[in-house]
Amino acid sequence: MDKETGKAARSASGRKITESVEFVAEGKDGTAEVEFVFDGSNLAGKTLVAFEKLYYGDKLYAVHTDLEDEDQTIHVPAAGTTASDKNTGTHHAYAGEYVELTDTIEYRNLLPGETYTLHGTVVEKETEQRLSEEKQQEFIPEKADGSIEIAFEINGTDLSGKTAVIYEEIKIDGKSIAEHKNPEAKEQSIYFPKIGTKAMDKKSKTQEGDAREKQTIIDQVSYENLLPGETYILKGVLMDKADGKEMTDKNNRKITGRTTFTPEKSAGTVEMTFELDARELGGKAVVVFENLYDEEDHLIADEANIDNADQTIIYKNNEKSAVSPKINTDNPKPSSSIRKSPKTGVENHTFLWMLTLGSLGTAVAAGIAIYRKKRD
């Protein structure tokens, strides 16, 4: 019987749980065993009470149908888990070398004062390969219902784009009485997002741009293993490949981009735009770095490889687009100590005409002097 409802309990197949046994009494007092075998996977957390009736032939001789009799009662424990990343406090985690996870196990229908052992393991969802050693933790519940936490440390370096699931099992005297091992359960899962980028110059539609004043970089950011309906923040910054430092504009501000989005599916793309003055970038390479954050601004994925060609825009040399140098107007007159170089063009022609006229004048003067001498 289901103690909560007072009705006959039913197995996972939907059938009432009944059993009967015939026996021959060897004396006026004795015992007989009745064994119930059924699929009870649907009864986690339930309290079952065995009702017994004794017949001799078709005649009812005795009954024992007390819902409050503890000796007839079976407590079916239940366990549910909620996994979270210690850093984010959510089901998202950054795929770093050291990842701390916390699993909160909520149990029901345990026996207060008894000693139980909690067994937990972290596995990779697709392969169910272990990501941690099995952890064991003893506890003695004060009440039938309650919760207990267990912590795990794993290496998440290779988990970008993958999902980790925490499996839990409660045992008493070495026997399993409750477990939660569903690889599809979101509550048990930790999601490690993954992003990739493909940058291009807006005008050329390639990864090569012109070193001109107003230039635009469009970055197509692909994502994997996000939770549909959740809110995410994408932040980007432009990097100078030569020195690996963040680029700044004329006001010494970083050249950044930012967008917020809510994916409809776990995988997809989102676009980021960057505006910059590229006049001084001829022959240089610009690399786009992207960081993905959850709604609470926790970093959960990034793409920050300075040598990634897909993230790189190269600007061609363009002499016409070079920034004009500043002219110093404070001292327009040249110093007298500086020797002037001969000029070319029209001014040079004037110099030649003056030289020619000077020569002719000298010749005429000399001729007049000779003529006067002869007359004398």
Regions found by a protein language model. Name each.
Residues A25-V37, K143-E153, E264-E275:
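Aromatic sugar-binding surface patches on proteins
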Residues F38-A50, T157-I166, A278-V288:
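Short glycine/proline/serine/threonine-rich loop/turn segments at secondary-structure transition edges
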Residues L60-A78, S176-P193, H298-S321:
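Short beta-strand elements
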Residues G80-H91, G196-Q207, N328, P342:
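Short, solvent-exposed loop/edge segments of extracellular or virion-exposed proteins
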Residues H92-T104, T206-Q220:
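Contiguous beta-strand segments within globular domains
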Residues K316-E347:
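C-terminal low-complexity, Ser/Thr- and acidic/Pro-rich disordered "stalk" regions positioned immediately N-terminal
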Residues T344-G358:
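Juxtamembrane/start-of-transmembrane alpha-helix segments at the extracytoplasmic/lumenal side
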Residues G361-D376:
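C-terminal membrane-anchoring or membrane-association module
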